[in-house]
Amino acid sequence: MSHLAELVANAAAAINQASDVAALDNVRVEYLGKKGHLTLQMTTLRDLPPEERPAAGAVINAAKEQVQQALNARKAELESAALDARLAAETIDISLPGRRIENGGLHPVTRTIDRIESFFGELGFTVATGPEIEDDYHNFDALNIPGHHPARADHDTFWFDATRLLRTQTSGVQIRTMKAQQPPIRIIAPGRVYRNDYDQTHTPMFHQMEGLIVDTNISFTNLKGTLHDFLRNFFEEDLQIRFRPSYFPFTEPSAEVDVMGKNGKWLEVLGCGMVHPNVLRNVGIDPEIYSGFAFGMGMERLTMLRYGVTDLRSFFENDLRFLKQFK
């Protein structure tokens, strides 16, 4: 205890003489380490009378705190000096060009959706959306596809239980819209749909867009004119287009639309038809007063045709070498 002040003075001198952080840490160990000079002073307390030990211990702790503060201050000085030296040694060539920030790009399917929404937006269509987890009423029953209908088997549906499913088409959005508002109705419904299928031209999840018009005096001629204009605008060519009879439970008459490819072969691009009277009745619209047409198309398929992509799965593999081609 008698030479405590001397130990503090010696520690202060050693701290001031430390030229780097490593040397400073050696001083810390020498005085405050497990076997350091000041730490060992605590062992002398056992030689003192019990009533003197608290005061003596406080003096030793104050000395240790004084040394610790000196260590902290010196460490801050050394670190600041080291930083100044490093900055002084470094040179920055301000004439060098900055690092280029690479801009991202839209996914090709997103480009297709935006392009189609823009076209139909100019015709007065609004975008409508709905849930991807659907019930069988909106996905099937209301669309004139009752439980016993063979068309249900064509959809390869992902079922959660007896009534809940991942929607196989965005047609449920049409049902919800017609239930929520009276004609005139003019909507497009883009979104993800799900079917249990996977190969070069099918994936379990894909994007679909459906369109719907319900009003008075809507005819198949209106449908043909609208889709003619759309396809020629989308592909930016004066395409040869044909409508061939088909069958969909929710439209009557129904048709599939083909375009002539560059190889001289017909390519199917979408399905369409006049809204079936049963569908209108299911949503409370009088088919004696109103009529309408609907169409549906796969976004990936149109994107493949527009950009010449041969494998549908390329859109979902997140390969930047592929995606950067569409920037």
Curated annotation (Swiss-Prot):
Protein name as catalogued: Phenylalanine--tRNA ligase alpha subunit
Enzyme Commission number: 6.1.1.20
Alphabetized HAMAP family for the sequence: Phe_tRNA_synth_alpha1
The protein's assembly and partners: Tetramer of two alpha and two beta subunits.
Gene: pheS
Alphabetical keyword list: Aminoacyl-tRNA synthetase, ATP-binding, Cytoplasm, Ligase, Magnesium, Metal-binding, Nucleotide-binding, Protein biosynthesis
Enzyme kind, highest EC tier: ligase
Lineage, opening ranks: Bacteria, Pseudomonadati, Pseudomonadota, Gammaproteobacteria, Enterobacterales
Cellular compartment(s): Cytoplasm
One CC-aspect GO term: cytoplasm
Species of the source: Salmonella newport (strain SL254)
Cofactor: Mg(2+)
Catalytic activity entry: tRNA(Phe) + L-phenylalanine + ATP = L-phenylalanyl-tRNA(Phe) + AMP + diphosphate + H(+)
Any Gene Ontology biological process: phenylalanyl-tRNA aminoacylation
